[in-house]
Amino acid sequence: APTAPADTVVSDISEARACTPNVSLTSASQRVRSLVAQMTIDEKLGQLNQAAGGRSKSLNSKLTPEELGKVRNGEIGSYLHVAGAEPLGELQKVAIEESRLGIPLLFAMDVVHGYRTIFPVPLAMAASWDPDVWREATVISADEASSAGLHWTFAPMVDIARDPRWGRIVESAGA
């Protein structure tokens, strides 16, 4: 396997696509530096763009050719609320295999009280006074979300509820 100093920029696109944790050429920071050096301004801006997917988005019924084109062109860096391993995998395949640099998409979802297995809202679980109940629910939610291809979730939410008028108090453990 090729090796290079940490400040080396990979100039060949095919070499950049081969930058995986199993290839000694790259550490994560080296891969990032290499990709950023090759990116156009539009591709860099695309990494800041998070598209709304909708919980049941599938490529066959919901994703338009225009949206796929944006993924191919590097105009989308992440998706919010695309549920299920199949649509995530299909979107990821387009990003990795059909975009210029093969940069993977990030996928995120609100998993405040479950992903596939739905649990009581956090405020209700807190009312049980049993931290193990909450811990078990969050472990199950994390396992389900990560196995479906999600990279990050917006949970658990650990803000202290100081004002009962706050509309998202139900997502916290309360005061």
Stretches with model-predicted labels:
Residues 9-175:
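N-terminal beta-rich core of secreted/periplasmic extracellular enzymes
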